[in-house]
């Protein structure tokens, strides 16, 4: 009899239970790696210039993964919005005169005169609980936004150039300055009116005074709350002292972000820590404290602000400042290997704007069709992608941060991408 060469036999072929054990061990190891990675967590940094909508993105994350807003938050926004709706109408009346727009309520014997007088003599701070609205932070922001003294101070400090790391510091107004400003410019000649009479006055001026609408159409030329028209349309809701802000009210409302806020979310078994840093110049010097161990940067840009100037310096275009800011962050040593997610936000407002204010007036190198929204957005997408001088990926999304339906889709895509990248780093995928 001949003899053949022996062939080694795999133990798995002899013992199927051993094969099952190896498979189970591999699965267990994979699960342990995933668990360790989820414990380590994901750090998402929200950045962008002031009023870009990044805090609205955070609000949408709360709606999706935190069960929405508390009763306290709803009360707070009701107070803040009531103040802003009154002050926004005051701003329109004052700015119309500066822009030499004829107001019906300024004409002799016009039936709208009493409504104008109510608005100009109203003091919203006498009608709310400042502590519920945010205490000192709220009063600080209110004075910064609406005090003529602070507007004049900003004009005097204006350089007309981008100052991305911000040496201006409007946020550090002390309590004496707050009290002085409130007693002088804000409370001057004020009277106590009922909320209903104020709401009626705002409603009449908004609906019937053609000059107010003309002034609103030119609001890119001065500083006005971005949701002022929404406030005016719903003014009777906000006039109700028992009214609790809806989700949409809160998404439309604005409370200035000061410092750096941290919010934790559990998304797909991963711990997400989202850091929202104040975007105005005076806040940016604080950013450096949250640059370490960042998984991804979410940079929010209000594309609709191509024709507006900064609140901090009315000689600087908001879009130009955002471009320089994005450049400094994207190409920073801190984020050399950190993926960037770019939200081109407020596209709904942008679509309406470019039909009235051609993009080429502000960006002469744009050679697309004047009223082609898609072409105009692509212009910005291309220019922002060109800024990247590294090999890291940049993911661009077109967003309307106040639209919960579309943001649910976008944020799901973003969090899925971040989770997948973390799994790849762990060797699980």
Swiss-Prot record:
Cofactor(s) recorded in Swiss-Prot or TrEMBL: Mg(2+)
Lipidation (N-myristoyl glycine): 2
Protein name as it appears in the record: Guanine nucleotide-binding protein subunit alpha
Record-level Gene Ontology MF annotations: G protein-coupled receptor binding; G-protein beta/gamma-subunit complex binding; GTP binding; GTPase activity; metal ion binding
Region ranges (G3 motif): 272-281
This protein's encoding gene: CAG1
Coiled coil: none
Region spans: G5 motif: 399-404
GO biological process: G protein-coupled receptor signaling pathway; pheromone-dependent signal transduction involved in conjugation with cellular fusion
GO cellular component: cytoplasm; heterotrimeric G-protein complex
PROSITE patterns in the cross-refs: G_ALPHA (PS51882)
Family: Belongs to the G-alpha family. G(q) subfamily.
Positions annotated to bind GTP: 51-56, 251, 257, 279, 345-346, 348, 401
Domain G-alpha: 40-429
Positions that bind Mg(2+): 55, 257
Its job: Guanine nucleotide-binding proteins (G proteins) are involved as modulators or transducers in various transmembrane signaling systems. Involved in the mating pathway.
A Pfam short name: G-alpha
Keywords from the named record: GTP-binding, Hydrolase, Lipoprotein, Magnesium, Metal-binding, Myristate, Nucleotide-binding, Palmitate, Transducer
Lipidation positions, renumbered (S-palmitoyl cysteine): 3
Chain positions covered by the region annotation G4 motif: 341-348
Subunit structure: G proteins are composed of 3 units; alpha, beta and gamma. The alpha chain contains the guanine nucleotide binding site.
């Amino acid at each position: 009899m001949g003899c053949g060469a022996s062939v080694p036999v795999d133990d798995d072929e002899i013992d199927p239970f051993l094969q099952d054990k190896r498979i189970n061990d591999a699965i267990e190891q994979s699960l342990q790696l995933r668990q360790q990675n989820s414990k380590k967590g994901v750090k998402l940094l929200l950045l962008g210039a002031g009023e870009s909508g990044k805090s609205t993105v955070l609000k949408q994350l709360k709606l999706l993964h935190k069960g929405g807003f508390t009763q306290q938050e709803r009360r707070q926004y009701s107070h803040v919005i009531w103040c802003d709706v009154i002050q926004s109408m005051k701003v329109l009346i004052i700015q119309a005169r500066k822009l030499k727009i004829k107001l019906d309520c300024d004409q002799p014997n016009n039936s709208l005169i009493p409504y104008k007088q109510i608005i100009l003599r109203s003091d919203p701070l006498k009608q709310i609980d400042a502590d519920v609205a945010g205490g000192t932070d709220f009063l600080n922001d209110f004075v910064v936004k609406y005090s003529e003294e602070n507007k004049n101070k900003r004009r005097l400090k204006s350089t007309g150039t981008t100052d991305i790391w911000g040496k201006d510091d409007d946020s550090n107004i002390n309590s004496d300055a707050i009290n002085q400003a409130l007693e002088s410019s804000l409370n001057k000649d004020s009277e106590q009116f009922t909320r209903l009479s104020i709401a009626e006055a705002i409603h009449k001026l908004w609906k019937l005074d053609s000059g107010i609408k003309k002034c609103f159409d030119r609001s890119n030329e001065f500083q006005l709350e971005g949701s002022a028209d929404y406030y005016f349309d719903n003014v009777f809701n906000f006039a109700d002292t028992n009214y609790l802000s809806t989700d949409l009210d809160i998404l439309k409302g604005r409370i200035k972000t000061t410092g750096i806020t941290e919010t934790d979310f559990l998304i797909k078994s991963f711990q997400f820590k989202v850091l929202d840093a104040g975007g105005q110049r005076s806040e940016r010097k604080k950013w450096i404290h949250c640059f370490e161990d960042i998984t991804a940067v979410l940079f929010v840009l209000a594309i609709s602000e191509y024709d507006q100037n900064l609140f901090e310096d009315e000689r600087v275009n908001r879009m130009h400042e955002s471009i320089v800011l994005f450049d400094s962050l994207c190409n920073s040593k801190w984020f050399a290997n950190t993926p960037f997610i770019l939200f081109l936000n407020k596209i709904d407002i942008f679509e309406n704007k470019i039909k009235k204010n051609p993009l080429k007036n502000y960006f002469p190198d744009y050679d697309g069709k004047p009223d082609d929204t898609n072409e105009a957005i692509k212009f910005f997408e291309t220019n922002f992608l060109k800024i990247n001088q590294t090999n890291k990926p940049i993911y661009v999304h077109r967003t309307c941060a106040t639209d919960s339906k579309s943001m649910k889709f976008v944020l799901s895509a973003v969090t899925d991408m971040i989770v997948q990248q973390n799994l790849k780093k762990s060797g699980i995928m």
